Amino acid sequence: MRKTKIIGTIGPASEDPAVFREMCLQGLNVARLNFSHGTHPEHQKKIDMIKAVREELGIPIAIMLDTKGPEYRIGTFQNGKIELKDGDAFTFTTRELQGDETTVSVSYKGLMEDLAIGDRILVNNGLVIFEVESLDETDACCRVLTGGVLSDRKSMSFPGKVLNQPFLSDHDREDLLFGIRNGVDFIAASFVSRKQDILDMKEFLHENGGDGIDVIAKIENQSGVDNIEEICSVCEGIMVARGDLGVEVPFTELPAIQKYLITKCRLLGKRVITATEMLESMIEKPRPTRAEISDVANAVYDGTSAVMLSGESAAGKNPVDAVRVMGEIAEETERHIDYVERFRRESYVIRNRVDAISHAACTMAIDLDASAIVVTSLSGLTVRMVSRFRPPVPILGLATNRDSWRKLALSWGVLPVLTEQFPSMEVLNYYAVRAARDVMDLQPGSTIVMTGGDTSGESGNTNVLRIETVP
């Protein structure tokens, strides 16, 4: 069983039900919808398709809504584009005007209040770089450090800066309401810089009936990296969004930052997704490059919860093969990881009862050479905490509602199983043992470790740790 989960972005190449169905059969766990592109009717069509296919297959494919996030763009040019050379003078302005070879307007009207002399401005994914030389109320006069072509409405970024634009735009609010109405499982919050960004989003979700949605913080700038612990304290996971992050920080630092974020989140018990250009060449070609294979494998070695396909599955020629190849790389890599040695070497912080029981369950599974850990959890918290310790055996997550069942699709090493609410511990134990036997085809005499809450139906009531033998 593959432990690392796979997220696939759904787009023109994968929105056909037959193609999406094959992606699911090849091991897709989460369907991502990128709300930086497309209209609500277009996304509605995709969501309806995803729900129909997962219902047909009877598998927990979760839906992730990826927000556009705070956006900073230049305006338009008289001729559509210009070319700048190193050393040229150029001005960004909040005044409304058509751009030319010397000046262009910007979308964020509070920009001049947030900038300082010496700041760098990156445009078009960092391809053209400017340094601020002087400022007034409306204009930032800059020197071109790295020249290139600028065209209409290209994105802007500001390395090392936290701008004061509200985190939730009107566009994002409308998208969140759309997601709530459609029962999405995850929100991927773009450009998270601090804890308050997540709190603002969660407050909006709470006010509009979206309490059950898990929020994944996309780390795309240095502030997000610096504030990772406080961000993790209020979100349900993070995404190492290497595209924009690689623009905001020196690209040579990206591998070390990725390893740091994965390790930090794993030890904190948060799901972590590694994303962007993982199998980029498969947009056009049927096979990945050797470097891409190593990239996916290294994320798996680091302990990422999931790896993500973007353009490969949304617009590529081989979306089904991309899922298959990613799964094969992950599964083969996992065969070479000594999870027992890693578990014994790691220094975990045990913060509460759920942590303690989850850690004990993993220890018992290793010491008894158990075939599986079976976890009953109303909210999925205990399952995620067992997953945090990356045990060497499969984790069966028994969920009593479909929302929790689908959200377990993103947890490392977890095989989600949908069950009913049981009237007593005896009935629960009976069902759990047989579920493990049937789902995993266990032999009589196999040992399983059981943990989770009792049958009271109260979330967070983890108090059970048992050893059972398969009859």
For each predicted feature, which ranges?
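Non-catalytic helical/linker scaffolds that mediate oligomerization, partner binding
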Residues: M1-P471
